[in-house]
Amino acid sequence: MGAAKKPAAAGVSTKAEREADLVMETNNSSIVSKRSVELLYYPKPHFFRYFVKRPPRRSPLINRGYWLRMHAMAESVRQFMKQPSDKPKFVLNLGCGFDPLPFILLSTDKSLCSTTRFVDIDYEKLMVNKKTAIRRTDEITRLLENVEFLSDESPIQIRSEQYLAIGCDLKNLKKLDDVLKTELLPSDCSILFLAEVSLTYMDVKSANAVLAWASKLNNDSQFCILEQFFPDGPNHPFASTMMKHFNKLGAPLYSIHEYRSLSEQEQRFRNAGWAHAQARSLWDLWSDNEFVGSSLRAWLDTVEPFDEWEEFALFASHYFLLVASTKPQTMVQELQKTPALTTEPDISSQYVLLAGNNPRGGQRRFGALIPDSENSMGHHSGLGRQTRDVSTDLYSTCKGMTTPQLPFPPREVSARMCHTVTSLRGGDCLLVGGRASPANAFQDCWLRQGKQWQSTKSLPAPRFRHSAVKITLETDSESVLVYGGKSSDGSIFDTWLLWQTHSNGWQEVEIQGARPPARFGACLESINQTTGVLFGGIGSDGIIIEDFWIWKIRHRSDGTVFLELTDHTEHLQQTPLSQYIYRFGSTVTRTSRGLVIVGGIIPRQIVPYECEIMLLDVGELLEYVENESSWGHRILSAIGLGGILQGARPLLVGHVACAIDPDQVLILGGGAVCFSFGTFWTEGGWVLKPAGSTAQNNWTLVPEAMHTPEPVASPKTPQISTALKLSSIRRIRVDTSEQFQQILADGKPVIIEGSDIGPCTELWTKEYLTDVVGSDRKVVVHESQSENMNFQAKNFSYVTKAFGDFLDEVHAGGRQYLRSISAELPSKLPANLAADFPGLKDDFKLPQALSLVTENAHSSPLRISGPVTMWLHYDVSSNTKQEGWKLRVADRYAQVMANVLCQIRGERRLVLFPPADVQYLQVPPGASSSTIDIFQNIKDGSIVSIPHTSPQEAVLNSGDILFIPPMWLHTASPTGGVSVAVNVFFRSLPKGYAAGRDVYGNRDLQAYEKARIDIQKMVRSFDGLPSDISRFYLLRLAQELKDNAGV
């Protein structure tokens, strides 16, 4: 599917051909995504590459989803080929598209394929194109014996001993039947039909005709079909998003409306003449060790960092694999199916879920709640519409409220997700860990105490997706208990850490008795001051853990504490609803009625509507535990989404929740990327309340501009010094390339003046740029509420707007900044002034003396800035090999970047720091940007005075060129008016391994990234030793690193 169009064949209506073309177009995205999977996960030789022109890179979610689809189909074929039989075997792929599955199996499982012949079947014109691609590919034809390429008019396009390609519309079953019986199939053989998301594009009557025909073609046939279904109805947010996507493409799904459930699909096949049919969701198959082994699941995480578990489960729960057979026994063993849904005891009628107003904004996932007052709450950081958001949304029930009662986290707390915030007495709270990317976990912790935020003792190791709960020890001191989580290198923790308000940092808690397996994303909550429950989470084998523990923290006479854990899984399984409590990414909130469990994902199936919210009766639980009696059915009840859902169904993943009243729960945020179909956001605040309550949902979002947090002072933050004298960067003229090469060799910044950079210095006025670029051209700009943009704090927004509007606003004093990105492929290609702004390319040039820059150019972004300062950072970038880039380190390399900054219009002031100063500039591990705002006061030009540093200053006028050597940290500030400039980044040093593609020039060398992971492993090697001994040896190792760095 996915061929270029040809004139309509005789007898085929124009409408029918258009519909066929739309169906074939669905193959384009699919085959590209499979190529992405092949690049990362499959050993060579690769075969998708011959059908996909450009080497793609899909997101980890798309990669894992397609990996599972590909594995499901390939594993089904392997199981068929492994079945003992004296008959010849045939694998008929109905609607094969450009999928090269036969060639992959012939290459990797040659002996297994010895008695099997593969037959690809699809539209005539698609198979003509597939034939052309195969004919010109020696790597494929060498796998085939006695291969023949027949004419385009022939029903058989390719014939060989192992493989045939047939062009035939599946609605023309007579033609297909004749070809197979006369040209291919012997009277006695075994057949496996494959249909991977192909029959569902046919009308139901035609698709069912294919199934009935296939069941009668041979008395030893099996059918393997992979398609979408509705595990929880078409109104589920993922399902509705998926259907809108396919309808928008003009290729709607048909069978899914007629056969919504797995049981209906199984009955469909039995009605079509198949003796046996078994359907299972891909999420169910993912957890089956016979289908996807635990070691294989664990290996996937070593290929690329992955943390899109909720979205992966949603996708896999909406696709099924069905295997049917003409014989009573199927080719796969009969496995235990998911039990039928039971919701008893059902208390949904006792609750109501109230939807709030849907304001513009407030869209964030995987954030954390910040306590404020009885009538207000903050939703901090998390993942916004485009990136992680450093801000905190203020929700309030008071109409006149504009600012929080207590301070929200300052911008020094870098944007993060999957972190925790635990409420303490008097409005205090503790923020712990989190992550940027899954490979960049945070170790820092922040305490709000006495209405002020301050950095507190960091975690022993970075972690995210951990669980945290407040406990009160016998000394009446408040503490925070943290369990589990995941680190940057993929390690999963089973440790319990204790933070106490009056102690120095974190201590690992000793465990007595059984120890729960390591996990992340678990459900942890207290049921009194020192006792609580633990359940769910994902373990090291990539599946949700189905257990239930009760923990109790105890004191010894010497003041130390230990944790006592008891496994009550068997007791819980006596209750009818136990299968729905084992969750990942759920919230657990303590209320007067018990623990309210909201959303998340569960093993093997989607969370059904009736069990989205559940109630664990704490009183019943404690009674059963104390009396050691059997657990009754009342301990766990289903609330669902209440008796009557008011509003559209929310998607309860990535959300946050808290008790706002003894028996009311507030739910904020959430949503998910619904695979490749679009993003669904749960907006506004939702309130779960008892049905008899008269309370209303008055929670609304307060506009962010009213409560933007100010930075707080920290003992480590440098203070402003207006008396600081900066050394000026020298100005020189450069007339020859030899002179510039000497500048490179010196490795010091210089301002090159008197060079000809083209007529841009005169032409690029506001009016000229608007006319040439186009007033309506869409650009993405940084829009800031502050005059100091901070990349770590993400105190700005990415806003898409018309270029003309941007110029109007920035010339009117708007705090905006444009750093152009690739117009064609912004996520894959670096900015290129000539390609992105062709109308400007003849206006700008580099002088001949800088030919080395032109010859080694990486990117050339256009920069237009108003009265706003840039963050302090350094530049380093990765690039791609010609044959296509891969995630594996050995296949990619980085280039340390130098750059020349060409000032076109206006004036710009820059401050630069030499590489050796980086240790004093508060650049977080793994980052290339500092947290310090160098320009603390734009009006008087003062900058921070930082001990042990040697800042240098450059003031650029129109026509000046600033050479910035590699690793020199730099920041820029306007000196009045609008600044227009062009950067040209170029490769100035030998190759070094990279951490990945970076079109913006801000990613570090792989050697550094790898070393950071090694440091984390080094720290963990001292686990179990007394803290003073661990500290002693870590300090010795730190000194060795300093010695090697020459410090």
Swiss-Prot record:
Residues 814-1003 form the JmjC domain. InterPro entries: Cupin_8, Gal_Oxase/kelch_b-propeller, JmjC_dom, Kelch-typ_b-propeller, Ppm1/Ppm2/Tcmp, SAM-dependent_MTases_sf. It catalyses: 7-[(3S)-3-amino-3-carboxypropyl]wyosine(37) in tRNA(Phe) + S-adenosyl-L-methionine = 7-[(3S)-(3-amino-3-methoxycarbonyl)propyl]wyosine(37) in tRNA(Phe) + S-adenosyl-L-homocysteine; 7-[(3S)-(3-amino-3-methoxycarbonyl)propyl]wyosine(37) in tRNA(Phe) + S-adenosyl-L-methionine + CO2 = wybutosine(37) in tRNA(Phe) + S-adenosyl-L-homocysteine + 2 H(+). Pathway: tRNA modification; wybutosine-tRNA(Phe) biosynthesis. GO terms for molecular function: tRNA methyltransferase activity. Pfam families: Cupin_8, Kelch_4, LCM. Keywords: Methyltransferase, S-adenosyl-L-methionine, Transferase, tRNA processing. Its EC number is 2.1.1.290, 2.3.1.231. GO terms for biological process: tRNA methylation; wybutosine biosynthetic process. S-adenosyl-L-methionine binds at R69, G95, D122, D169, L170, E196. It comes from the Eukaryota. PANTHER family: TRNA WYBUTOSINE-SYNTHESIZING PROTEIN 4. Belongs to the methyltransferase superfamily. LCMT family. Probable S-adenosyl-L-methionine-dependent methyltransferase that acts as a component of the wybutosine biosynthesis pathway. Wybutosine is a hyper modified guanosine with a tricyclic base found at the 3'-position adjacent to the anticodon of eukaryotic phenylalanine tRNA. May methylate the carboxyl group of leucine residues to form alpha-leucine ester residues. This is tRNA wybutosine-synthesizing protein 4. It comes from Aspergillus fumigatus (strain ATCC MYA-4609 / CBS 101355 / FGSC A1100 / Af293).
